Amino acid sequence: MGKNLRIKTGNRAPLLAQGETSRALSDLEEGSNVQPENVGFCRVIKLARHDAGKLVIATMALLVASLSNILVPKYGGKIIDIVSRDVRRPEDKAQALDDVTGTILYIVIIVVTGSVCTALRAWLFNSASERVVARLRKDLFSHLVNQEIAFFDVTRTGELLSRLSEDTQIIKNAATTNLSEALRNITTTSIGLGFMFATSWKLTLLALVIVPVISIAVRKFGRFLRELSHQTQAAAAVASSIAEESFGAIRTVRSFAQESHEVLRYGEKVDETLKLGLKQAKVVGMFSGGLNAASTLSVVIVVIYGANLTINGYMTTGSLTSFILYSLTVGSSVSALSGLYTTVMKASGASRRVFQLLDRVSSMANSGDRCPTNENDGEVELDDVWFAYPSRPSHMILKGITLKLTPGSKVALVGPSGGGKTTIANLIERFYDPLKGRILLNGVPLPEISHQFLHRKVSIVSQEPVLFNCSIEENIAYGLEGKASSADVENAAKMANAHNFICSFPDQYKTVVGERGIRLSGGQKQRVAIARALLMNPRVLLLDEATSALDAESEYLVQDAMDSLMKGRTVLVIAHRLSTVKSADTVAVISDGQIVESGTHDELLSRDGIYTALVKRQLQGPRFEGTSNATAEIEPISNGQ
């Protein structure tokens, strides 16, 4: 009796004090309060290192374009000096016209060259920016999809989507496009200042008096805007989470007529984002206005002093004109830099959120590389396993579970909802690691086994299987990464009693099932999921029987498919049907995280214990009146524990 099961009993003490558990999980609980080690702008720039060659060419083109922008005022000033000459004699007039024509020709050459270089610079920087955002999104998605399941238990999907799309876009602009503009304006400013000093060092020093004041203001403004931008992006991510949640549960929303509630809930978060955005707009507006006023005042003072120098003969009219044009060009570049600084501060807030995720280290140990196969292939053992979900560390779900499944055996788990049945299946799949104890496959602890090998050997069919928004064929072959032939897929579908309904569709195996398989019925989804598991040909099967209402024919087809799936495999089934329990080699009753009874169906009934009470309560309950013993449910749908 119960040969496939070992039980340890006795008093169980809490494995970890509540404070210790909480500290171990602080990165999950604190969320955005955990700061990445390095979010400096240099790290953002490093994202474009793969395009360094193209960016060097773009930078050279940028320098030429910036120089051309400054040379135009220089030759414009020459034209002023030429037309200011005394040209009363015909030969002087002819010479002046020749000089003007030659100067204009120089200006045309400069403008054409600058335009070509500007186009080249824009093309190279923009193409690099697209590659940067693609690379960043791939890296971020790859990092996220390899995080432990506990991370997704406490992190909203909408927030992750916001970081993948919106935040990466902001960083892209900062890393390339805005960098291009910043370099252009810095170069233009530097060259312009050089020409200004060459024209009149006195006027230049006067123009630069205001620079220290502006620098201090920009620094303080940048710090404030960076934090405000971070808060705005965080609020937008929460709004995205609500929208994603509402769309994903739209049938539940509709069935409870809660559309207006969801609209209100989303609107409240959007209003929070709007409030922060308006505050940000106000601050940016005040800063831009103040900067513009300071720059304009500086130009006015320079013009007044320059006019005085010209009147007194220290400058020519052309030189003053060139200087004014230089100062306007430099002022325009500085103003553009202030706008780019605003964007960079926003990118700093976004990069903090993205790099926080990229720097996050999974709390689960890395998988090993062992691929254990022996004469006991398919043996699973849980040895004194204690476990609490990271999102609820103070609530111990499993308390010293010891359970052994011999190859080819069938063990059924029954018991009250919340007892820990589904948690046992989750741990065997290594969705989580136990806090204490070991789980072994073929005698090897799960952390030492190759991730790919483990999930080729172990498959799970849950109560509500999840299908992807692709064809039925792609869903069935999902675990084999497209390496399954059409014949293999069709054979698996036949074994799962899915072939006939698939062939009834116009596109047959090419039929797209919709998001989460929404275009298929419950029974059809379950049979496709069974076919997917059959194609993987696992040695260990974790089966959570569906308790959702199916019509008699669908229930028969699903049950028949499950029987085919279980043949010749080690099976751990979370049982809800009496027929499944009767056919099990061992039945384990799970209550409050412990195995309280075990044995065969008949042995447990003869003991007149908890199992007997469960069966009697279910068979005598009003919801099962008229239900035969063969199909009666042992336990209502569990709550995922």
Swiss-Prot record:
Annotated GO biological process: aluminum ion transmembrane transport; detoxification of aluminum ion; response to aluminum ion; transmembrane transport
Organism lineage string: Eukaryota, Viridiplantae, Streptophyta, Embryophyta, Tracheophyta
Keyword Plastid: no
Keywords linked to the UniProt accession: ATP-binding, Membrane, Nucleotide-binding, Transmembrane, Transmembrane helix, Transport, Vacuole
The keyword Lipid metabolism appears for this protein: no
Job description of the protein: Metal transporter involved in the sequestration of aluminum into vacuoles, which is required for cellular detoxification of aluminum.
Main localization category: membrane
Annotated ATP binding sites: G415, P416, S417, G418, G419, G420, K421, T422
Family of the protein in this entry: Belongs to the ABC transporter superfamily. ABCB family. Multidrug resistance exporter (TC 3.A.1.201) subfamily.
One GO CC term on file: membrane
Superkingdom of this protein's organism: Eukaryota
Tissues with expression: Expressed in primary roots ans lateral roots.
ABC transmembrane type-1 domain residues: 55-346
Residues passing through the membrane, by range: 52-72, 100-120, 191-211, 284-304, 320-340
Topology relative to the membrane: Multi-pass membrane protein
Entry's localization field: Vacuole membrane
Protein name: ABC transporter B family member 25
Coiled-coil stretches noted in the UniProt entry, renumbered to this chain: none
Null mutant phenotype: No visible phenotype under normal growth conditions, but mutant plants are hypersensitive to aluminum.
GO molecular function terms noted in the UniProt entry: ABC-type transporter activity; aluminum ion transmembrane transporter activity; ATP binding; ATP hydrolysis activity; ATPase-coupled transmembrane transporter activity
Organism: Oryza sativa subsp. japonica (Rice)
